[in-house]
């Protein structure tokens, strides 16, 4: 499948950059747009000045600047990150989705929940379902009062989910699965990562030969995803 990705890259194809005909800003979720404006403002080096400038701009102008829309036109990235739940039909039967599943000790399913677009809001909703117990420990011999830490760093879990969103092959129409067992948390996207051999990515200075969803990735960076 990576050969297909490479061909797409060589001819300049980017699924996430495609304009969605007939879609408009009315197909985007108001809460997601508001959150996108906040995050994009936070991303600016001069935050105070940026807030003053961005307040004067319309929603579509801010989305243009954030690299989510193109000249006011709605992209697949815009629908994926900010689209209303009822705008799923623009994906032609494919539902961009995160599914959280909680398993019992015998690996039977105890509970599950689906989180659909807008993905900007779905990440936090999915994270809120994941158990992240507090651990107490005493740091050194200078104190008898224990510190409390999360079992998992919240930002690390969100980064994993964001990476699954950014680097999926949406042409294959899969979904993201967050699977929670008693002793581990597993995140699965139904397509191969780039590179398919993980050891290559661990080599110092390694750069993949191509990227998926460059437009989407840049937009997510602008929104602190």
Which residue stretches match the model-derived regions?
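Conserved N-terminal catalytic/coupling substructures associated with nucleotide/phosphate chemistry
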Residues: 1-154, 158-225
